[in-house]
Amino acid sequence: MKLSKYIDHTLLKPQATEKDILKLIEEAKTYDFASVCVNPSWVKLAYENLKDTDVKVCTVVGFPLGATSTASKVYETKVAIEDGADEIDMVISVGQLKSGNDEYVKEEIKKIVEASKNKLVKVIIETCLLTEEEKVKACTLSKEAGADYVKTSTGFSTGGAKPEDIKLMRETVGKNMGVKASGGIHTREEMEVMIENGATRIGASCGVELVK
């Protein structure tokens, strides 16, 4: 697979304007990235501009804290799919996970998978807030719930992707589930290290620099 197809070209800053999003979209077309990842209010715009290409539209749900209710996340997912999203990056309920409420976490992911209507679902586990044991549990629950990917980070918390976390996540989910590294990846060397450790997708706001 060519390097560009690993990349979700990402712009999730709250101050991003329509002009910024359109620039992101044009870059994704030019460099043939896997997707653009935008906030939900920009999904329609991205869909309209990408529907005749093979660049997917990715959006976020329960972002960035993961602390909204399951019902809210399910509704967000349904609206995003209606608006044209191909991929959903949902944030796990970190507090519920850390409280040992495994069934809550698993059922929530399962409901979002169902609401996504066979679109790709990636579960952001926010590795920087978890112990090693919690990282393993988050990955296991995501896999059991039918998600397609586990993802390291929102990029809005206390840390981003680390190679050792990618390695642990890959070992936990096995070879048939996707692993997405995101947060703090700024160079091609960093991206290649993530891929070597098992990442099958890279989330980055500097996608153009990564493939130049």
Swiss-Prot record:
Catalytically driven reaction(s): 2-deoxy-D-ribose 5-phosphate = D-glyceraldehyde 3-phosphate + acetaldehyde
EC numbers for this chain: 4.1.2.4
> What Pfam families does the annotation carry?
DeoC
Q: Which family does it belong to?
A: Belongs to the DeoC/FbaB aldolase family. DeoC type 1 subfamily.
- Report the superkingdom from the record: Bacteria
Gene Ontology CC:
cytoplasm
Q: Which UniProt keywords apply?
A: Cytoplasm, Lyase, Schiff base
Q: Which organism is it from?
A: Clostridium botulinum (strain Kyoto / Type A2)
- The answer to keyword Transport applying to this record is no
Question: Mind telling me what this protein is named?
Answer: Deoxyribose-phosphate aldolase
Claim: Nucleus is one of the keywords in the record: no
